[in-house]
Design a protein with these regions (language model features):
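Catalytic core of pol beta-like nucleotidyltransferases
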Residues: 1-29, 35-41, 51-110
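Short beta-strand->loop micro-motif that forms the acidic, two-metal-ion catalytic signature
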Residues: 45-49
């Protein structure tokens, strides 16, 4: 289970994504070791951003939000966002990709 600080950072990131992406944002999920609660002090914070459209501009905005949120507040760990469309994520699930299955099972919707 993530800590309060990790959840606060993830929520700040989601709010930033909502402002930057608008209706293109579908969902943000925290995944990886911080979502599972077994992170080391130097672990990053993995976040999956699901969008309606696939374009470089949206991916760039997601990374700009991550940089702004993590640097602007002096958080003790790095944000590592991954963005993809819902359609792509569903395809990974259908293809039984472990990455997608882990996120589906362990990811926390923010």
């Amino acid at each position: 289970m993530p800590t309060t600080l990790e959840l606060e950072l993830a929520q700040a990131f989601r709010h930033g994504c909502q402002d930057a992406l608008g209706e293109d944002l579908v969902e943000v999920r925290m995944d990886g070791s911080r979502a599972r609660g077994d992170a080391r002090p130097d672990s990053d914070l993995d976040l999956l951003v699901l969008t309606r459209r696939n374009c470089a501009e949206l991916r760039e905005r997601v990374h700009e939000v991550a940089a702004s949120v993590s640097l602007g507040r002096g958080w003790p760990f790095t944000l590592m966002p991954q963005s993809m469309t819902c359609e792509h994520f569903e395809g990974l699930l259908r293809g039984e990709r472990l990455y997608a299955q882990d996120i589906q099972r362990e990811g926390i919707i923010i």
